[in-house]
Every structure is written in C-alpha cells, then in structure tokens.
C-alpha cells in the first residue's frame, strides 16, 4: 500500500471495541500491505473545547515530523474511490509514513487540521467513530485493489 518499509497508521480517538466494527477493521487491515497499525487513543474529558484540546495533544504526541498526515473531517474533500486511490498512489510515492487521523465526537481541533497534509471527508453522513474506522479501512483496501487492477472494485456498475 505504501512504499516498501513505509508505515501506515490509523490514529483514532475512542476505545478499541470488540464489536462488529472492530471485526471489519481487522478484516480489511489484514488484507492491506503493509498491514496498518491501528492506534486507539482515549476520549478527552471536560468541556467541548477542552476535549478537543486534550485529544489533539494525544494525536500530536503520536505523529512524527516526517508523517504525511491525512485528517478525516467533515470539512474535507469527499473523493470517490478512484480519486482516493489516485491520492493514495501519490502519497505512497513520497515514501513518507502515512497517518490517517480520526477525531472524537467533538471533531478535530484546528491544530490537527493545520498539521494535516490533506483533509478528507467520508461524506456528509454522520458516522459513529468506530464505523468511520471500518469505512476507512475498507476504502484503503479498495484503493489498493484499484491500484493493483484487482476486480474487487467494479467501477461503473449499474
């Protein structure tokens, strides 16, 4: 998925669950090469502003200077799967470790958006954060298949 030796991480606010969403994340993550590291960070506490600040602090501690950061945020671009695959191909060519960031219930603090190299949205629907992880993992797998010419992605199907 990324250049040889490059890391792929999904950094998400919220506990790791043992439910069906976690099963989906694990299923798609196992199909990815390299297999992504899924980092679950605790939810922040306090007022909404304090929650966002604490969650941003935790995320920033997990990011390295060389990471290519892709933040998932409602205000981001919502590419289709083919466009996402093209973006992934260009990011992979940088040989930088990729870090996809999913915020908590209050969203991502401005510092994370500013640190991001790209800001994407999974669409206008509101998703539970565990489901957002599963959707991201599936789209990463789908992008890998598109780039490899694998028939998993059937573009233009009625």
Swiss-Prot record:
Principal EC category: transferase
Disulfide bonds: none
EC numbers: 2.1.1.177
Keyword Cytoplasm found: yes
GO molecular function: rRNA (pseudouridine-N3-)-methyltransferase activity
Cellular component per GO, a single term: cytoplasm
SUPFAM superfamilies, alphabetized: alpha/beta knot (SSF75217)
Catalytic activity: pseudouridine(1915) in 23S rRNA + S-adenosyl-L-methionine = N(3)-methylpseudouridine(1915) in 23S rRNA + S-adenosyl-L-homocysteine + H(+)
HAMAP family tied to this protein: 23SrRNA_methyltr_H
Name by which UniProt lists this protein: Ribosomal RNA large subunit methyltransferase H
Family: Belongs to the RNA methyltransferase RlmH family.
Organism per entry: Acidiphilium cryptum (strain JF-5)
InterPro entries cross-referenced by the UniProt entry: Alpha/beta_knot_MTases, RlmH-like, tRNA_m1G_MTases_N
